[in-house]
Each structure stands twice: as structure tokens, then as C-alpha cells.
């Protein structure tokens, strides 16, 4: 579906969050001539990518009254995907400037480089002027076909405002999910969620069990092998007989999921192996969490399914006045944020027409039924994975944008394959240099960069 008509509306829009999703949402909304206020509880842009050495006093982050630390970034974190495919389409994630030694020019750079990229993006498009820093949104609710937004700044001063629309970009890496294992409530050792992991020092000479073997699980388990006595990874995606020593370390083992844990400190795996452990690290993901949102029960979060949402973005009965950017995972995040933001901005201006509420609900119901028929758990509702190409290209079609570049999709597929097959070396060894060249030639052709990087010219 191509854009339906020329722009007709200029609205007052609240954006919640100034991370990677909120920044590009603000830019696209302003491009559609909307007036934008971005609410950000931190003192700077970047959201998830703003590192702090601080962690929460409750290591599992289960206490609802705890002091919340919003970052989940650990000190050694590097990106899981190549930088070429990570960035926004018209602001590529290339080293800026090339000769600045304070920047990380690696293909899989550190979290500090990602934050610097987002700061560059905000500076380039003059987005900071739209942001209210140190301001937390405490309530969002519909009011007379508009939206009431109540916020509170760091001085404790509250403010009530009315907006035509609200775009939720608050991220989903703050409210941890923990593993449910028989006996774990009475297990005597220490437990911590990856949300509160920063550096490995606390695990010196310990036997550590890490639950989860994707992204943070793979990273953290290898990060602590340098100080821990033993590290054992448990994963429910592994067959029940799984037991192997992983390459690249002499004290790292991969297991099937935990069968049970016991008051004497032992942990029994489904493969029959028994370990006497000191600490369990839960690398088990996060919950979608919108404590400020009151829709009178229309929007619910059940087993990590946020709904009902049309194409993961619009609640049919409240669209386009309420929208969500960035819920899907296992995808090209920044690129998806950009496409979703363009769609939301165009729908609010009237340049793109959404289907009727009834048709959107039909599509939501059909999507849920399809996933259930394939036996996919509800908690995977927003997991794109192999469906991301169709999803991203579909949104691009709605706004009249070209589909995603083939090199971009090939890079993410290759990146996930290397992550799964060479978790100890995937960030520093690859076999797709031709895709790097293709990406940079594309940037050059679009005049997004002025020249090819020196390392490409030398190759």
C-alpha cells in the first residue's frame, strides 16, 4: 500500500524515551511537521546504551520498591551485529571521524561507540532541543480523544499536559525475567540477573551457573571465565543430553537446562550432571513494562505479549493516537525503529491511512492464531527472526519507502549464524567482506559518506 494522500494534520505529540527508538521517532515526527516533546528520565540521550557502573541493590530486581537502574549494559559489551547493518538508513553507523582515536572503529564496536553514534545522530538532526531531560512520565491516559500526560522532573515538580498523540519508546531492558526452576527459592547461593551484571570481579574463584545462552548469556559466561573457577551454561533450547566443553576456554561447559536445585547448594541438570555452585546468573531476558500507561485494560501484557497491537505498533481501538516503537526483537533494531517511526508519523499526519479498527483487529487475531498453530509460545509474540524481512519490507511499502537492502539482510543473517556457531570469535572473524564493501559503496552512492574507509581502499 502506497501513501494515501498528502499531509493534512500537524499534531502535538509526546514521545516517551530518548533512546535509539525515541530519537528517530522525534526526527520523523518533526519531518512530518508535528510538534514534539520527548520525555527522558536520564540526563542524556541514549537510553539503554548509557552505561553506568551502578547496579540495583536487589540483584534479581524483584523488589517492586527497589531503586531502579535503567541501564542493562555491562562494561565489556560489544554489539552482536556488524555496524554497517545496525545504523539508521540515512545516517550509517560508520566511524566518525575516522582518525579520532577516542572512537571504536571495530566492525563490532563497544557500547560506548553506539552511544557516541546516537549522540552524533541527535546532534546532526538537532533533536536535543526537543528533549526534557531528568523528567519521568508517571501517567499516560486517554482524555476526550486526546492524551493526558503527567510527568515529574528531578526537582519533584509535576506537570499535566494534553497531547494529540503519544509514542511509547521506553525500551524493554529494565524489568528482568527470571528462570523458574524447582527448588530455586530455597537455594542458598547467590542469584543475580544479567541486568545487574557489570564486571566479572565478584565471581573470582567461584563455580557459576549461567542460565541462558543467547546474547548476554554467551557474553557474560565468557567474560567471567577469566576469574571464575568453573562456568556452566544451562539452556532450555539445548537437547536434554547436552554436555560439552566450549572452545576458547578450559573452564566453560554447556549443558541442557537445569532439572532442579537443592538446599545443599547442588544444581542438577537434565543431562544428569551435578554441580556444587556458588552463584546463578539469570540471563533470561526482560519483561515489557509500561507502569505509566492507563488504557482502562485495553492494552495488556500477558506472558510478554503486548496487545492487541496491529503489526506490533498500533492498538486498533486507540490508533493512531497511541503507538509503540521497538517492541519486536531478533531483528535490525535501529532500522526497524526508523521504519516504524516513519509509519507512525505519516499515519498521524494523515499522509498514510490505517485500516479500520475492525480490519486491524482481524489481522491481530489472525496473527495470534497463526503463531499458536505453529506452536510458538506467547512470550515469542514479538520475536521476528526469520520473518523480519517480510515485516520490515511491508512497513517500508506502507510509507512508500524502498525495501531493505539485500546486503543489510544478508549481514544480519550471517551475523546471527556466526553468533550461534562461533560464539567466542564471531566479533573478530568473518567471511563476508564483500558485504562490507557493498554497504559502503551504497552509502557512497547515496552521498551519506564522502569516501570509502581507508581499510576498504587497501583491500
UniProtKB/Swiss-Prot annotation:
**A Pfam cross-reference name:** FMO-like
Entry GO MF terms: 8-methylthiopropyl glucosinolate S-oxygenase activity; flavin adenine dinucleotide binding; monooxygenase activity; N,N-dimethylaniline monooxygenase activity; NADP binding
* Keywords on record: FAD, Flavoprotein, Monooxygenase, NADP, Oxidoreductase
Tell me which Gene Ontology terms the entry assigns under biological process.
floral organ morphogenesis; glucosinolate biosynthetic process; regulation of hormone biosynthetic process; regulation of organ growth
Instruction: Spell out the reaction equation it catalyses.
Output: a (Z)-omega-(methylsulfanyl)-N-sulfo-alkylhydroximate S-glucoside + NADPH + O2 + H(+) = a (Z)-omega-(methylsulfinyl)-alkyl-glucosinolate + NADP(+) + H2O
Q: What happens when the gene is disrupted?
A: Increased accumulation of methylthiooctyl glucosinolates in seeds.
Which residues of this UniProt protein bind NADP(+)?
A: 212-217
For this protein, the record's InterPro entries field holds:
FAD/NAD-bd_sf, Flavin_mOase, Flavin_mOase-like, FMO-like
Q: Where does FAD bind?
A: 17-22
The UniProt record lists the EC number as 1.14.13.237
Q: What does this protein do?
A: Catalyzes the conversion of methylthioalkyl glucosinolates into methylsulfinylalkyl glucosinolates. Specific for 8-methylthiooctyl (8-MTO) glucosinolates.
Give the family this protein belongs to, as stated in its UniProt record: Belongs to the FMO family.
Q: Spell out the protein name for this chain.
A: Flavin-containing monooxygenase FMO GS-OX5
